[in-house]
Amino acid sequence: MTLRPMTLRSMTLRLAIADDIEALADLGRRAFVAKFGDLYSAANLAAFLAESHTPEKVARELADPGMAIAVIDEPGDPTGKTIGAFCKITYASTLPRHSDALAPFELKQLYTDPGLVGRGMGARLMDWALDQARKAGADELQLSVYADNPDAQRFYARYGLEKIADITFRVGDHIDPEILMAVRL
């Protein structure tokens, strides 16, 4: 079966609500493990997931006025309760400072259900993130991407993001090489 890209009309993009907390934590865990799980020891992976992809963490993020979370509901779910993809942005970047931007936004996470990759959800969420940053007066959108993830780097480059620095990212006790990417708005 060939998956076809979804049309913008068939995607329901909305802001996350409290009822989404469990689904966001679950999708975050599943997407991270599917893409990167084999890179880490069981202990490091478990520590990272317990720190970064729990309902408690998502609840704190959802309550944070400095963060916004958008979701796209999974197509064809009659309940409308299954999230196919999500994007988290912060209104002030927490990444290491490597640019002269005065008001940078940060794209924290953009995750798609592993079975739905390639259907346009990531593109729709990326458009949303850039739109939110521009509307709020940000002068730059920044993100961190794993150095050995060329597919993600190409995806972000389509939106004008370029490498501005080499940085690191911690997964448990493991330190990953990351690339700081940014685009001026």
Model-derived segments and their meaning:
Residues 1-22:
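Conserved N-terminal entry element of GNAT/NAT acetyltransferase domains
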